[in-house]
Amino acid sequence: MSVQRPIRVLVVDDSPTMANMLTALLTEEPRIEVVGRAGDGNRAVQLARLLRPDVITMDLLLPGLDGPGAIAAIMSQSPARILVVSAVAEQRGVDLGFQAMSAGALELIGKPNVTNAEELRRWGKELAHSVCLMAEVPVISRRPRAATAPPPPTGARVDIFGVVASTGGPPALADVLSKLPRSLPVPLLIAQHITVGFTQGMVRWLSQVTPLPVSIAKDGERLEPGRVYFPLDGHDLLVDAAGLARLQPSQGGPCPSGDVMLTSLAAAFGRRSGGVVLTGMGEDGARGLLAIRRAGGVTFSQDEASSVVFGMPRAALDVKATDQGVPLASMPELILQSCTFAPFRGGRPEGGPTR
């Protein structure tokens, strides 16, 4: 897309007040032009086809055709980059958000729950920034055919895996977790960048697609094989030398931090740690994945063809944290093949590298 041309945005919200506010906040960014507004899902589908916007901001609780239904129709008829803007306080809205991600939405953002003008303006700048980033993402209406996966690494088997994801991550995680068996012999830790307020909804949604129990980790909890753990909203998830989960408030940057999580796995488990970086913008996860590789552990990153956004996997390749990209469809098998089938022991194995 030419840098001179404005980013054309379609705003979809059934509340005229909210639509007016979103329009005003977005157009404070000189690069953005709001070209249309829709108050229901059917009108959104019509305007997406007529206007061909670069980005659509989509509410979910819409009259008639709801948000996920509208997104599915748009992605099949006139694909666009879709940014969900929904009320976090409403559980149905949160749950619909992950249905929207499955239908093709790229990102979830909670509606502002503020009355202070300065805080509202700050939220608006973050929204506009997200729209500008989304405008650079290639529109994907159909997943390309996966390439052949590399053979699994030989050597030490893995006792714990950490997975990092951002834009496009929830559907990718659902795809991977749905193919892992209940007998998975290791704990699986997830750092998915997401707006505060959506984590519990993501846990509920993923629990419906995988045989593995999915939960939010508690500080000091002993990690169990065959379970999936997410951090508490606004926190990073780490592992200590005894194999216990540790939560700490995020210190800025991507939240939760994939680098923080993966680095803790490398320190605690050494050559028996494993890390995966999936689709996403930016560079989070690359340093942590490199720490695992330097400790002798197993590392994978998603390939470009199956990534919604190749930024994070590319960063992992650039720092040589992994040798080549892996098709998303091959990731579950590689994770399984890398796991030890001995009992999970927790902590650094005997003979692992020193800190």
From Swiss-Prot:
Give UniProt keywords alphabetically: Chemotaxis, Cytoplasm, Hydrolase, Phosphoprotein
Protein's GO biological process = chemotaxis
**E.C. code:** 3.1.1.61, 3.5.1.44
Q: Which SMART domains match?
A: REC
Query: Per the record, what is one GO cellular component?
Result: cytoplasm
State the disulfide connectivity.
Answer: none
Provide the catalytic activity annotation. [protein]-L-glutamate 5-O-methyl ester + H2O = L-glutamyl-[protein] + methanol + H(+); L-glutaminyl-[protein] + H2O = L-glutamyl-[protein] + NH4(+)
Any one Gene Ontology molecular-function term assigned to this protein's record: phosphorelay response regulator activity
Q: Where in the cell is it found?
A: Cytoplasm
Does the keyword field hold GTP-binding?
no
**Domain CheB-type methylesterase: start-end pairs:** 152-337
Residue numbers bearing the 4-aspartylphosphate modification: D59
Q: Which residues form the Response regulatory domain?
A: 8-126
Output the PTM entry.
Phosphorylated by CheA. Phosphorylation of the N-terminal regulatory domain activates the methylesterase activity.
Please explain the role this protein plays, according to its UniProt record: Involved in chemotaxis. Part of a chemotaxis signal transduction system that modulates chemotaxis in response to various stimuli. Catalyzes the demethylation of specific methylglutamate residues introduced into the chemoreceptors (methyl-accepting chemotaxis proteins or MCP) by CheR. Also mediates the irreversible deamidation of specific glutamine residues to glutamic acid.
Swiss-Prot/TrEMBL domain comment: Contains a C-terminal catalytic domain, and an N-terminal region which modulates catalytic activity.
Could you tell me which PANTHER family the record lists for this protein? PROTEIN-GLUTAMATE METHYLESTERASE/PROTEIN-GLUTAMINE GLUTAMINASE, PROTEIN-GLUTAMATE METHYLESTERASE_PROTEIN-GLUTAMINE GLUTAMINASE
Q: What's the name of the protein?
A: Protein-glutamate methylesterase/protein-glutamine glutaminase 3
Organism of derivation: Myxococcus xanthus (strain DK1622)
Q: What are the leading ranks of the lineage?
A: Bacteria, Pseudomonadati, Myxococcota, Myxococcia, Myxococcales
